[in-house]
A protein has these predicted regions:
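Sec-dependent bacterial lipoprotein signal peptides
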Residues: 1-19
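Residue-level signal for functionally critical sites in structured catalytic/ligand-binding pockets
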Residues: 3-4, 24, 44
Length: 133
């Protein structure tokens, strides 16, 4: 009986550690800090963000995108997905640091006015200061 209890405990601990490792690896994918710039501050949080960091996975962003309203073309940009948590104090042209954030819940009311944005959308968390390595 003791052997059966010991074996069951060992299995549970192994499964628990495996889950922790998988969770840790997923978090590592989104833990890098990047530098970006708010390129367009369109109405109703239709924001376009440019990537300034060389270590960013550019497959997550639009390689090139043209704003239909101005005709200006941007490189390595994405649409803001985290509309509820993006600081209002950041204006077009401002540079800031951010991490990718797939965990934040975005349940705020946002108006439906349209302004063109890139086809790729990312949720981010703006950092208080420069990235710490």
């Amino acid at each position: 009986m003791k052997i059966l209890l010991l074996a069951a405990s060992l299995v549970l601990l192994t499964v628990k550690e495996d889950c922790k490792k998988k969770k840790g690896n997923a978090a590592a994918n989104f833990s890098s800090c990047y530098k970006g710039r708010l390129e367009i501050k369109g109405g109703c949080m239709n924001y376009t963000i440019g990537i300034l960091s060389s270590n960013f996975d550019t497959s997550l962003a639009a390689a090139t995108w043209t704003d239909d309203n101005t005709g200006k073309t941007y490189k390595n940009v994405f649409a803001l997905g985290s509309k509820c948590t993006f600081p209002e104090s950041i204006n077009a042209g401002d540079e800031f640091y951010f991490t990718l954030d797939s965990t934040s819940v975005q349940n705020c009311a946002v108006c439906l006015m349209y302004y063109p944005v890139p086809p790729k959308r990312l949720s981010i968390k703006v950092m208080q200061g420069p990235c710490q390595q």
